[in-house]
Amino acid sequence: MRTREKSYEDYGLTKEEIHYIKEFCFNSNTEQQKEIIKVALSELSPYIASKCLESLIHNKSYDDLCKEEYLYIGKDDFYGYRRKGMAAVKRWMIWNHIWEM
């Protein structure tokens, strides 16, 4: 299955977990939290990782990012990789004993 076609459920993420990950990323105020997000997203290509990082930390949608600059990735692909990145953030949170769900 292509990354763009995978859903949150395919990554084993529930609605509560999605909300928890988004809140963790948006409220990441320590260097440790930001480093966990960066390392987790490093599983993606550097360009996609940087855009997913900006999206998660600043709570920006694909359209918000497109208003600032042209994105070299389609909307479906962007959100597919963002979901994959969120699953990676969850894994890194578990490995670093930060996951509290």
What are the roles of these predicted feature ranges?
Residues 1-43, 63, 70, 91-101:
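N-terminal interaction/assembly modules
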Residues 29-33, 56-58, 78:
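Short acidic alpha-helix initiation/capping motifs at coil-to-helix transition points
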Residues 43-62:
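Short amphipathic alpha helix immediately N-terminal
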Residues 58-76:
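Helix-turn-helix DNA-binding module
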Residues 78-96:
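DNA major-groove recognition helices of helix-turn-helix
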